[in-house]
Amino acid sequence: MTPADLDTARQSALLAALPEPQRARVLEGAQVQSVETGQTIFLQDDPADALFIVLDGWVKLYRIATSGTEAVVSVMTRGRSFGEAVALKGGIYPVSAEAITPARLVRIDATRLRNLLQSDPVLATSMLAATYVHLQQLVEQVEHLKARSGVQRVAEFLLDLAA
């Protein structure tokens, strides 16, 4: 992992609030994974064996309904993390993840992270706080989806891209 990769990972919402020694422990065993446009990172209902931080590119999180239609849940960009809550629980991914551009990701092994959390109360408390912040962001996202028209959501998305 390059110094720039480490900076991006350290500044992610998942790790930014952690004390530096804990951040270093989490990233110690992490790997950089490169994916091409259209490449599947994981599928809905796969065992959640890792969580990810986007270094570069865009990743789409989506669900396939029983009717076979695809519902995009979120689009992740640089510095955003995904898969953390379910990976920490040891469950299955509730969504699929696919690169929509060439992308580079930090892949953090879920079992290793769960072991770290059990042995380090400071890390466990900090990760819990980070997960809570992520939950707040998801609640705000649902509110935006329900309270805005499609045109308003597209305009807001484009404004976010320009920022």
Where are these regions (language model features)?
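Polybasic "coupling" helices that flank or enter modular domains
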Residues: 100, 118-163
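Cyclic nucleotide-binding regulatory domains
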Residues: 14, 39-102
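Cyclic nucleotide-binding regulatory module and flanking cytosolic helices
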Residues: 1-37, 81-82, 86-87
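Short capping/connector residues at structural and topological boundaries
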Residues: 19-23, 46-47, 87, 93, ...
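Conserved active-site beta-strand element of glycosyltransferases/polysaccharide synthases
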Residues: 106
